[in-house]
């Protein structure tokens, strides 16, 4: 038993002198492992008389428990010290300024669309939408566009087959609305449209918004007043507006709308090509054939329609000279519109 006491004292001294958890583990294996010194003492019980084995075995177990207890306590102190050091190293200084967050913003095209929609919904128009993949009838036939019209050319329109295509305007939404609703109808139709064209002022995909009003006793003066008021509100200034006679298959009479150049106030500049005027939209009274093909009696109801390119208005409002900037996803450009 003197050897046992000496072995325990030796083990406890080793535990206290250990400098880290790895050293403790080596001490545990040396004294308490399968081939450890205290374990080997337990194996000598077989050499003792039977009557002494219980007593000696109990003493050995007490010795092992004592060493284990001290070893675990020492290990816990190391772990606590390690945790304390780690927390100190990772301490967050709450007095430091936080990391700034960059706030997002609406895309200028989205801003422009919302501004247009807001004006028309405030004066009683609804928002109508339709498919971007359209059939030939709704994109052309129902709008009084004959088969020989240049717009049907493969050079201007993206066809899937002889009957299906990417819509070239949002006018098909007007046709579908007239087919499904009875007058009075007051709608604007925003959406993406597709034409085979690409340069600094054109894109193969762009946004268009068209308007339609169908009711009794509607005339060109109603159309003129609506457009003039829209341009005044959209650009937030009084602008001279003129209507030039034009031709569209789906309206009669038809007109192109020019407004006083917002860049030079009509004095003449590079943007307006020294004319003082900017073309902003097309419009006209809905052709009787279009009303008739949509199931509306042109003798009882009249209507007007107009259409404008959203990118065109955004370029004029924000002073952007290259349409492609809207689609380059350059944050340096887009950040200006927050």
Curated annotation (Swiss-Prot):
Domain of life: Bacteria
Cofactor note: Binds 2 magnesium ions per tetramer.
GO CC terms: cytoplasm
Signal peptide extent: none
Subunit structure: Tetramer of two alpha and two beta subunits.
Localization (cell): Cytoplasm
NCBIfam families (UniProt xref): pheS (TIGR00468)
Protein family: Belongs to the class-II aminoacyl-tRNA synthetase family. Phe-tRNA synthetase alpha subunit type 1 subfamily.
Name of the featured protein: Phenylalanine--tRNA ligase alpha subunit
Main location per the UniProt record: cytoplasm
A Gene Ontology BP annotation from the UniProt entry: phenylalanyl-tRNA aminoacylation
Top-level enzyme category: ligase
Molecular-function GO terms, alphabetical: ATP binding; magnesium ion binding; phenylalanine-tRNA ligase activity; tRNA binding
Needed cofactors: Mg(2+)
Name of the gene this protein is made from: pheS
Residues bound to Mg(2+): 252
HAMAP family: Phe_tRNA_synth_alpha1
């Amino acid at each position: 038993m003197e050897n046992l006491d000496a072995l325990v004292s030796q083990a406890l001294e080793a535990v206290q002198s250990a400098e880290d958890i790895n050293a403790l583990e080596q001490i545990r294996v040396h004294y308490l492992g399968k081939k450890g010194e205290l374990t080997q003492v337990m194996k000598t019980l077989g050499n003792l008389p039977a009557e002494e084995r219980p007593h000696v075995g109990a003493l050995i177990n007490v010795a092992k428990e004592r060493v284990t207890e001290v070893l675990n306590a020492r290990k816990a102190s190391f772990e606590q010290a390690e945790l304390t050091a780690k927390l100190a190293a990772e301490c967050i200084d709450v007095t430091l300024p936080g990391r700034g967050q960059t706030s997002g913003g609406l895309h200028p095209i989205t801003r422009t669309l919302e501004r247009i929609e807001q004006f028309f919904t405030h004066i009683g128009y609804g928002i109508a939408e339709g498919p971007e993949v359209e059939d030939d009838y709704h994109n052309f036939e129902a709008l009084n566009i004959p088969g020989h019209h240049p717009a049907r050319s493969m050079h201007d329109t993206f066809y899937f087959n002889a009957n299906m295509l990417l819509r070239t305007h949002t006018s098909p939404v007007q046709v579908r609305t007239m087919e499904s609703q009875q007058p009075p109808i007051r709608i604007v139709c925003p959406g993406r449209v597709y034409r085979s064209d690409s340069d600094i002022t054109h894109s193969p995909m762009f946004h268009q918004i068209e308007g339609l009003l169908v009711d009794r006793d509607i005339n060109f003066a109603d159309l003129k007043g609506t457009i003039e008021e829209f341009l005044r509100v959209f650009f937030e200034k009084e602008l001279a507006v003129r209507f030039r006679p034009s031709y569209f298959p789906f309206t009669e009479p038809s007109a192109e709308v020019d407004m006083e150049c917002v860049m030079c106030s009509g004095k003449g500049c590079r943007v307006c090509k020294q004319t003082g005027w900017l073309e902003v939209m097309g419009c006209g009274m809905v052709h009787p054939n279009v009303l008739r093909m949509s199931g509306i009696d042109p003798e009882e109801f009249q209507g007007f329609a107009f259409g404008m390119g959203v990118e065109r208005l955004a370029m004029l409002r924000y002073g952007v000279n290259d349409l492609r900037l809207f689609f380059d996803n350059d944050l340096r450009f887009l950040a200006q519109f927050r």
